[in-house]
Curated annotation (Swiss-Prot):
Pfam families: RimP_N. One of its GO terms (cellular component) is cytosol. InterPro entries: Ribosome_maturation_RimP (IPR003728), RimP_N (IPR028989), RimP_N_sf (IPR035956). Required for maturation of 30S ribosomal subunits. It is found in: Cytoplasm. The keyword Mitochondrion does not apply. The gene is rimP. Its main location: cytoplasm. The keyword Disulfide bond does not apply. The lineage of its organism: Bacteria, Pseudomonadati, Spirochaetota, Spirochaetia, Spirochaetales. GO terms for biological process: ribosomal small subunit assembly; translation. This is Ribosome maturation factor RimP. Signal peptide: none annotated. It comes from the Bacteria. Keywords: Cytoplasm, Ribosome biogenesis.
Length: 143
């Protein structure tokens, strides 16, 4: 499939719905092949985000997208998952207070995102609390 829909267009179409429900848009992937497409959306709202909420969101988002998109498409909505790889600085802010596995050198260290800032975040382990620059992070994932 070839990616042709602008992700920011999808973002703008669904942002109002997610904002009203206090839900963060983590990631959007859009693909189109001939007259069919696929839209994948990853959403997050702390611990109180169940299957019923996802089902309701799917219906609301589908209606918003069907008005604009003039071809058949499938819509997949999911949550980040237990071991999601953190892909951007913005996600550190979204996942504040969550446990992560962090690789700075060659080993993973487990700890908590205590506070995310503009250029880094405070990482708390059982033994220390340190400030880490996003540019120093080799890998990070939820744990």
């Amino acid at each position: 499939m070839v990616k042709i829909i602008d992700n920011s267009e999808v973002y703008n179409l669904i942002k109002n719905v997610t904002d009203q429900l206090g839900i963060e848009i983590i990631e959007i992937n859009t693909f189109k092949k001939r007259d069919e497409g696929r839209i994948q959306i990853v959403l997050y709202k702390g611990n109180d985000f169940g299957v019923d909420t996802l089902c309701d969101l799917h219906k609301m988002i589908l209606l918003s997208l069907e008005v604009v998109l003039k071809y058949n498409f499938s819509l997949e909505i999911s949550t980040p998952g237990i071991n999601r790889k953190i892909k951007s600085d913005r996600e550190f802010k979204i996942f504040e207070g969550r446990k992560i596995k962090l690789m700075l050198d060659n080993d993973f260290e487990e700890g908590l995102i205590l506070k995310a800032e503009a250029d880094g975040f405070i990482f708390k382990t059982d033994t220390k609390e340190i400030r880490i620059l996003y540019s120093d992070v080799k890998k990070a994932k939820l744990s």
